[in-house]
Amino acid sequence: MAGNQNQTGEQSVNETERYLELTPKSRAIWEEAKNYLPGGDSRNSIFWEPYPFFVESSSGCHVIDADGVDRVDFINTMTTMILGHAPKVVMQAVEEQLAKGVAYNAPNEHQVRLAKILCQRIPSFDLLRFTNSGTEATLNTLRAARAFTGKSRFAKAEGGYHGTHDSVTVSLRVNPDQAGDADRPNALPSSAGLPDGVVE
């Protein structure tokens, strides 16, 4: 058993060294980014040690980083890119829409058409609301659930990422020594600055 642990540790060190060799430009960008962005990025959910690679371009299931390393993307923007990166049909539709305007402070028919398609295809959808992010979606969902049930508490998947608002920034990456019992895990704040009642 100890031999396997040593082997795994050595493999991890070798992989980290290889990563450092392949990504010097990403590291330089990250070092500069830390001067302007907390932690070097606007999204702490996509940070990993020792630093993230910075994407230069993407196509299909591939992303190319600032150092020219071509990687197969198994995350696909947390599974939102179901057609892959930069599919021609989507790029063409986006270009056509951009020519008509970038953003409006008013509704447009496209959202009605998409909402209708989704409600017709998903039987449990009576009505829906589009959001800008998963964080906004879970924040609004919890607010609606509290209003509907009159209850303030809810269950959250241990170790699961559900956005970055206060209510769900709990137990994202938990050290096994702090996790507690598997049947009743400890709720641990994943960030400083959370209100006292969040982890109760």
Residue ranges and their predicted role:
Residues M1-N6:
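N-terminal acidic, proline/glycine-rich, low-complexity intrinsically disordered segments
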Residues G9-S57, G197:
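Active-site-adjacent loop/helix segments that line or gate small-molecule/cofactor pockets in enzymes
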Residues T23-R27, S57, G84, K88, ...:
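Electropositive phosphate-/nucleotide-binding environments in soluble metabolic enzymes
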Residues P24-E32, H62-V69, C119-Q120:
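Short, hydrophobic/aliphatic alpha-helical segments
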Residues P52-I75:
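Active-site and channel-lining beta-strand-loop segments
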Residues S59, T80-L83, V199-E200:
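Short, well-ordered beta-strand elements within core beta-sheets of diverse protein domains
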Residues D70-K151:
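Glycine-rich loop-to-alpha-helix module at the N-terminal edge of alpha/beta enzyme cores
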Residues K116-E200:
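PLP-dependent aspartate aminotransferase-fold enzymes
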